[in-house]
Structures are given as C-alpha cells and as structure tokens.
Amino acid sequence: HVTGVQTCALPICDKLESLFPVIDADCSDSGSFDAVLEFMLMSGRSLQESVMMMIPEAWQSDVNMDQQKRDFYEFNSAIMEPWDGPASIVFSDGHYIGAVLDRNGLRPSRYYVTKDDKVIMASEVGVVHVDPSNVLLKGRLQPGKMFLIDFEQGRLIPDEELKRDISAKRPYGDWLAEQKVTLADIAKPDNILSLEDADGEDALLRRKQAF
C-alpha cells in the first residue's frame, strides 16, 4: 500500500516503491500472470516452486496425495490464491522449459517427445507433422500436473519427482503444526452465548438475529 510505504521508517522502505505496481492496471490475464511469476522469481523462489504456488493441484480433497506435497500446498495457499484459469501455461527461465495445466483441466495440452530429441506441445495433435515411427513418447497434460524439461540434465523430469523435491526442501508440515490457527482453536468469550447455549424464546431470538 502506498500509504504504508510513505510512512515506513525503515531504510528498506525507501526502495519498496520501485517494486510497485507488480501488475499494471491495463494488463491482460496472461500479462498479469507473467508479472507475478517474474516477481516471485526475483524474490528468490525457483521457477518450479513459483509455478506450483500459482497453479496448484486440487489438493484439499485428495486423500491419496503425498503428505509433504499436501503440506506444501496448504502452507502456500495462505500466501498465494490459485490462478484457476482456465489456463495452460508455458514457462521458461533459460534453464528449464515447461508447461502446467490448471486444476480444472479445461485447456487441452498434448505433447510428443521424438526419438531425435524434439518436444512438441500444442492444444491439438497434428499442429506439426511428426512421423509416427519417430515418436518416443506422447500424452496429454493432466489437471494440475506439470511438464518440465531440464536443459542442463537434458531430460524430462516427471511431475511426481519434481514436486517431491520441491515439497521436501522446507518443513512445511512443521510450520503448519506450529503456526496454523483454526476457528476451533480460538476460545469462545465467556460472555457470549452460542445458539446451543440458549433455550426457549432466547434461542428463537438468537436464531432470528443470526438469520
């Protein structure tokens, strides 16, 4: 906030104005996403971590999800609202190139990996002619999944591997256990009666007021 920056007495606050606005008012959806992703990269996060934060999987109800990955998503959900698109995003920082589909999965993203080390991704197959005999691998991005190529390693990194590595870098589960506060954790003031505590006409009045 501009007012907060103007009244800040710390030396670092003199430099904060150069960061804003992160998103220009007339920016498109794609431009806004690009601006926030670049901002997160400049803050020290890796490309993969930033994209995982911005376009998470549907983790809340997935009982089969690895606990470390669930902890990563839950912790970062307090920092970043999900960009649910619908969107299929392609990204690169010169060291990696990848793509991710938002968790609703409404944008088709199909890919070919050829035997002569080419990768082709588009909304539909056939955008670029590929000899079937030259196809090493083909598939489509699944909702919330990431497709990532590491230029330095020269390989395609599976979604499960890259997210496992990112999720294990910090003790997100410990942080949640220590710092997460839910409504059930907040003590009820002694002078406030809940609907369950009231009876008779008092209960009826409280229900009317609540309605």
Which role fits each region the language model picked out?
Residues 1-8:
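Single conserved hydrophobic/aromatic residue that forms the stacking wall/gate
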Residues 9, 36-39, 43-150, 163-165, ...:
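Conserved mixed alpha/beta core segments that line enzyme active sites in large multi-domain catalysts
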Residues 11-45:
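Glycine-rich phosphate-binding loop plus the immediately following alpha-helix
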Residues 26-31, 126-128, 181-189:
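Low-complexity, flexible helical/coil segments
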Residues 54, 64-67, 77, 100-102, ...:
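Extended, highly charged accessory segments
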